[in-house]
């Protein structure tokens, strides 16, 4: 059984009963995060996964990395983390797969941008295909719709995390079109309602999923679902 807990915005905590993953550690400064940094640290994640370097995704990465938790991301993000005291960072690139005791993560393309809050270049933005808890998950990161999502869908996805906020990423209608390409069993919307510009409505995305026979689960911050 895989438990997935929303921590607001695009931040999720995954627990398969043995190992735990933190995706996009945007905790402090996240107006939708229902827990403290200290609480999440006490959950002892096995790894931190980051799709790109923008502050609302990079977040508190160094608080975990400096404590020895591996940060898994692009080579540029891992290099930045290592230069700032996160000595176990794992640098990858698009097309590569990192394997660990808990499972694996592969980097895919994403159509967006990537730089750290201080302006340092963060490499290419990515999506993540995660094998964890007996499930295959696609975390799209921040992205627009792109046709090669069909190739990601060929991996037979159990779950897709998709941004729907619009303005900086695709909105709910475009995210609905990705379901035709990705063909996941379940989809979870993310990256909406955190800031005024992110106006995408999860109810619209749910309707898009219903039209395509995809189960959409809308998680409030702090809410948990299971696969």
From Swiss-Prot:
Keyword Transmembrane helix applies: no
Entry-linked Gene3D superfamilies: Ribonuclease Z/Hydroxyacylglutathione hydrolase-like (3.60.15.10)
Keyword Nucleotidyltransferase: no
SMART domains membership: Lactamase_B (SM00849)
SUPFAM superfamilies hit by this protein: Metallo-hydrolase/oxidoreductase (SSF56281)
Keywords recorded for this protein, A-Z: Hydrolase
InterPro entries hit by this protein: Metallo-B-lactamas (IPR001279), RibonucZ/Hydroxyglut_hydro (IPR036866), UPF0173 (IPR022877), UPF0173_UPF0282_UlaG_hydrolase (IPR050114)
A molecular-function term among this protein's GO annotations: hydrolase activity
One Pfam family of this chain: Lactamase_B_2
UniProt family annotation: Belongs to the UPF0173 family.
Name by which UniProt lists this protein: UPF0173 metal-dependent hydrolase DR_0006
């Amino acid at each position: 059984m895989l438990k997935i807990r929303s921590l607001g915005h695009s931040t999720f905590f995954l627990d398969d009963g043995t190992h735990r993953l933190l995706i996009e550690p945007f905790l402090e400064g996240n107006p939708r995060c229902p827990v403290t940094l200290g609480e999440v640290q006490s959950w002892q994640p096995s790894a931190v996964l980051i799709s790109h370097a923008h502050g609302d995704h990079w977040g508190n990465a160094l608080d975990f990395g400096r404590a020895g938790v591996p940060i898994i991301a692009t080579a540029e993000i891992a290099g930045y983390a290592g230069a700032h005291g996160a000595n176990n960072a794992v640098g990858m690139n698009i097309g590569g797969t990192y394997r660990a005791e808990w499972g694996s993560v592969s980097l895919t393309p994403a159509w967006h941008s990537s730089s750290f809050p201080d302006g340092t270049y963060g490499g290419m933005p990515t999506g993540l295909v995660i094998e964890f808890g007996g499930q295959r998950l696609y975390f799209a990161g921040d992205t627009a719709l792109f046709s090669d999502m069909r190739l990601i869908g060929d991996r037979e996805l159990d779950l897709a995390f998709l941004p729907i906020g619009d303005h900086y990423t695709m909105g709910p209608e475009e995210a609905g079109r990705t379901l035709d390409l990705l063909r996941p069993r379940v989809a979870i919307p993310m990256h909406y309602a955190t800031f005024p510009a992110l106006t995408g409505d999860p109810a619209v995305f749910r309707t898009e999923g219903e039209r395509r026979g995809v189960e959409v689960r809308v998680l409030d911050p702090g809410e948990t679902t299971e696969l």
